[in-house]
Design a protein with these regions (language model features):
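Beta-propeller-forming repeat regions
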Residues: 1-416
Length: 416
């Protein structure tokens, strides 16, 4: 029998300056090694100590050092300061948009502002040409993913009060992208919380999930039809939402934070009642430690991802605390440790499940985006974070240990 494997994480902080709420990675200089993009910078891998500008980093703030003295600090005011501010850079999505073989990056700005992509100039000593492609990207969890099933990702978001997606012109992706509305205009706004993609009803087509239900993708998208809405409450408005068969019964369930600025993480079990799709709520974590089987509690889950962290074939929940979402005041437990956790999914034969929480880190947290992927190419998913504490990579390590060592590292249930 093979020795059990212990999963640990090593934090590397690339910067303590606040430039963005979302960072990502790709090989930007084509040297075969992944680099990090965070705000106006990209950091050369594998060391990430040498950085280059995508665009001019002009933001600064004045930090008082006493009654008569201030110092100018680069970046937006975050953990290095005292007041709450916001960056102009919330999500980063690398992709080769113009097909020249060099990775570019799509940047979604502050909610309600424009989305642009920066064209890789193929040399590290130049700013990247900026292409504004969509004028107003609403929702606090927009994404860039293949919603339509055509093999090409779309910008999925809200604009002008409706859900939909924007597509580039393949012959000229620098031109303004085309908007395809999928919902009626219902007053959705730039600060609407909670959105995700997934095949809810198992018809092979990707649906759009939001806090009040899900929009069913029709068989044909010709003519931009309005999608069918199925009302189901999925919390008050979290962050990224996911459709996944949690308990292995063949039906996709929904995983979401209950609210991005307070407490709560849940999965909604899909079941059928006379052929009708219904959901049953299972709270994984909430405002009281007793509401988690292992006594874990933290707030501000403003980014939630679903990734197989331990290679067992089941997707696990990866999330954390968005440090100072609204600054020093406002959100509950706002000054608690900026933790990251992964919740290991364990399926039982009777279709019951457990999500075992493992702390990844206690001094980084998440932004509005959390990117989980194999940065150092060792076969294990790492975490990339940009937020008010700075820019981080949390490197995933795994080593065989004795049964006693493994058992000592396991979380202990405090309730049934």
């Amino acid at each position: 029998m093979a020795d059990p494997v212990l999963h640990t994480f090593k934090r590397q902080q690339l910067s303590d300056q606040f430039w963005c709420e979302g960072a990502s990675f790709a090989d930007f200089n084509r040297d075969g090694v992944n680099d990090i993009v965070s705000g106006p910078w990209w950091y050369e891998g594998p060391g990430f100590t040498h950085r280059h500008e995508l665009y001019a980093p002009t933001a600064t703030f004045a930090l008082p050092l006493g009654p008569m003295t201030t110092v100018t600090v680069p970046g937006f005011e975050g953990a290095l300061g005292n007041k709450n501010t916001y960056s102009d850079n919330f999500f980063a999505f690398p992709r080769d948009f113009n097909g020249d073989g060099w990775m570019d990056v799509l940047i979604v700005g502050f909610p309600g502002k424009e989305t642009v992509w920066f064209e890789n100039p193929k040399t590290p000593d130049r700013h990247w040409p900026r292409h504004e492609v969509f004028p107003q990207t609403d929702n606090e969890s927009p994404t860039f993913a293949d919603l339509t099933g055509d093999g090409t990702p779309e910008l999925v978001c809200i604009t002008e009060g409706a859900y939909g997606y924007a597509t580039p012109d393949p012959s000229d992706p620098a031109k303004p992208w085309t908007w395809h509305r999928i919902s009626p205009v219902k007053g959705y706004g730039n600060f609407t919380h909670g959105m995700g993609l997934g095949d809810v009803n198992g018809d092979g087509r990707t649906d759009l999930i939001e806090k009040d239900g899900w929009w069913e993708q029709p068989a044909s998208l010709a003519g931009d039809p309005v999608w069918t809405f199925h009302a189901t409450p999925f919390g008050l408005g979290g962050s990224q939402m996911h459709a996944y068969d949690v308990n292995g019964d063949g039906l996709n369930d929904v995983i979401t934070a209950l609210t991005a600025h307070a407490f709560g993480l849940a999965w909604y079990e899909q079941y059928r009642d006379g052929g009708e799709i219904k959901f049953r709520e299972h709270i994984l974590m909430n405002k009281e430690p007793s509401e988690n089987r292992y006594g874990v509690k933290f707030s501000e889950l403003h980014a939630v991802e679903l990734v197989d962290m331990d290679g067992d074939g089941l997707k696990d929940i990866v999330t954390g605390k968005r440090f100072w979402s609204h600054g020093r005041v406002g959100d509950p437990d706002r000054n608690q440790a900026a933790v990251n956790y992964w919740f290991r999914l364990v399926r039982e034969p009777d279709h019951s499940v457990d999500f075992i929480p493992y702390r990844i880190d206690d001094n980084s947290g998440v932004g509005t985006q959390l990117v989980v992927g194999d940065v150092d190419r060792n076969g294990l998913p790492d975490l990339v974070v940009g937020n008010k504490k700075g820019t981080f990579v949390l490197f995933h390590e795994a080593k065989p240990v004795s049964q006693a060592e493994w058992q000592k590292a396991q979380p202990t249930p405090v309730s049934k």
